[in-house]
Amino acid sequence: MDNKQYNALFSFIWNIANDVLVHAFEKGDYKKIILPFMVLRRIDVLLESTKAAVLEKKEFCDSHHLADYTPFLTQVTGYPFYNTSAFTMKTLKNEIDPQRLKMNIIEYFNGFSQDVQDIIDKFKLRQQVDNLIEANRLGSLLEKFTDENINLSVKPVMQEVINEDGTKEMVERLPGLDNHTMGTIFEELLRKFNEENNVTEAGEHFTPRDYVRLLGQLAIEPIKDKITDNTYTIYDGACGTGGILTIVQEEIERIANEEGKRVRTSIFGQELQPDTYATCKADLMISGNINKFSYRLGSVDHQYIAFGSTISQDGHAGEKFDFCISNPPFGTPWKEDLKKWGIEDKKEITDPRFFDGVTSFIPEIGDCQMLFLANNISRMKDSPLGTRIVEVHNGSSLFTGKAGGGESNLRKYIIENDLLEAIIQMPDNDFYNTKIATYIWVVTNRKEERRKGKVQLIDASNIKTVLDKHLGKKNCYTSDKNRKEILDLLVNFQNNDNSVILDNEEFGYWDVEVLRPAKNDKGETVMVKGKVKYVKDKYSFQIPYNYEGGIERFFEKEVQQRDPEAILGKATLGYEIRFANYFSRKVDAKETKDLQVKIGSMQKEVLSLLPKLSDWFRTDNIDLKESKNPIFGKIPAHWDEIQFKYCFD
C-alpha cells in the first residue's frame, strides 16, 4: 500500500465519524464506535466468500450430532475463526427496521467463534449497538464500512480488465491491508480522536514501523551467524496492537533466510488496554501468525496473547523466550497493580521477577517502565544462544532512583552480571505523540568475548531522515540507510564520535553519608559515655566506583581537608548512566554567534541596574532585629535580603 492509498483509506474511515456520528454522539465517543467496527469489518470480509460453505458444514455437523464442530468450520474458512449466523455486514445493512436490525446483528455477534466473542466483548460492541440503534445510526454505519471503495482485508481486491488486444486479466483494484499498516491506521485514528478532544494517553506511544524494524535487526543481526534451523520465540509484554511482534518476526525470518537457515517463530504477548488487545488478537488471527490461541506450560493453559497487566497479572508466568522486544509505557503510574496484588505498599511485593528475597528492583510508583525491563530479565533462557532483550525507554531509566533504590538496583544487577551490551540514543521527534528522545537498551546473557566486561554507548540522535510532512509530532524516520549506519556502529564495536566503549565499573558510584559531631546550643561537641556523638549530615557525597584510592582517599582529599571533624558514614553502591557525559554536542556556528549577542545584551542590562541595587542593599538599609538566641545578637529581619546583598559585595 503506497502513501496515496494509505491516505485515501485513512481519510475515508476518519470521515465516517463526521458523516454518521456527528450530532448523535459526543466527539469523545467516536473512537469507541469507529475503531471496533473497523476491526469487525476486517474479520467479516474474510468470511464472506465461505459463508454458504460454513452454513452447509454446520448443518452437516448438527445432523451428525457433532458437539465440537470448530475443526470442521475453520478448515472451511481457512482461518482460526468462523461465523455460523446467516448474516454478514453487507446483508445486515439491508434491514431498515431498527429493532429487527438490532436482533439480526446480535445474532450475527453470537454466531462468531469463541475468540472473536472475546474481541467483541473487549470492544463492548453489544453496548455500542444499543447506542447506535437508539440514535438510528447503525444502518448508516454498516453502509459506510461495507463501501466498495475501501478494503480492510489482508487480501487485495481484484477486478477483471480487458486489454487492447481483447485478452482478459485480473488486476489489483484495492491493495490488501497488512497487520502493521492496520495497527498504524488504528493508532493514528486514536491519536487524532484524542487530539480532537484534548486527550493524551500518558506514556503510551505507538512504535513507528521504521523504528520497529531497527529493533528487530538489533536483536538478530549481531548473532545471525549463530542462528540454526530451529524454532525461536518472540515476546512483547507491552504488545499494543501487535506491530512489534509481527515486524520483528518478519525481520528474524528474513535475516535467517538470508543466512540459509530455516527457522520458525512463535509469538507471545500481553496487553492491558481492551481496545488495543482486541485489535492485536484480531490481526494476529487474520494474518495467520497464530493458528491456535492457547498453549500449555506444565499443567497450566496460557493465551499466546494474554489480557491484563504484565506487572501484576503475568500471562506467561514461568515462560522463557529467545527474544524479548518491548516499548513499555513511559512515566505511567502503576499504583493500580498494588490493588490487583491485594496489597497497599510496594514493600509487600514478593513476585520473584521484581524481588529476589534480598534485593528489590521495584521502582517508584510514578513510573512502571523499569518493571517491564525486570520482567524481561526474568525471561532469559539458559541456553547456548541465551536471550536477547531489545527494549525502548525514555531517559529517566538511565539515572533515576537513589543508590539502593529499585531503579538503581536493577541497573546494578544488569551491569554487574554483565548483561548490558549497548544503549542507543535515538533522535527526538521520532514518535507520533511525543517529542522526547528515546533510548534502546540491548541486553543479553550471552555476550561475545570482546564485549565481556564492557558496555557500548551509541549516539544515534542525529542519524535520521527528515519527513516531508510531519505525522503528529514525528518529523523524522529511520531509513534503511540509517538503520545500516546504526547497526554498523553496534557490530563494529569501536570508539568514535558516535560510539563509546566503557568498562562496566564506569557506571558505579558510592553514595556516602557524612557524619559530623553533634553540637549543643553553645556550639559545644556533644559527648555520650565519653565518646563523641555523631549525626548524619543532610548531604551525602557521590564517589566514582573506580576512584583511585577508593572511598577513604576521596573522603580524606575532598571532605576532611575542608571539614576535619567529619567522618565516613554508610556507603551504598549505586549505578547510573549519564549518557550525555560521554558525547559532545556539536553547536552550529550561527547558534553560537546568536547566543553571544543575547548574552552581551543581558550583560549591559544587568550592569545598568547594579548601581541602584547595590545602593539599596547597603548594610544600613537592612532592618535588624534582636535574635531570640543571645549568641547571635542582632540579625537581619529578612534573611533573603542579607543573602542577596552578598551577591553584590
Question: Positions of the model-derived regions?
Answer:
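Non-catalytic, mostly N-terminal accessory regions of nucleic-acid modification and defense proteins
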Residues: 1-223, 292-297, 302, 310, ...
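A conserved structural/catalytic subdomain of Rossmann-like adenosyl-cofactor enzymes
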Residues: 4, 312-614, 618
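Positions in alpha-helical segments
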Residues: 15, 232, 265-267, 626-630
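Hydrophobic/aromatic-lined pockets within catalytic cores
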Residues: 21, 38-44, 48, 190, ...
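Structured loop/turn residues at beta-strand edges in well-structured enzyme cores
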Residues: 28, 180, 232, 262, ...
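Hydrophobic C-terminal alpha-helix "anchor/cap" residues
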Residues: 145, 215, 413-414, 648
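Conserved S-adenosyl-L-methionine
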Residues: 204-326, 331-336, 340-344, 394-396, ...
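Amphipathic alpha-helical segments that form coiled-coils or helix-hairpins used
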Residues: 611-649
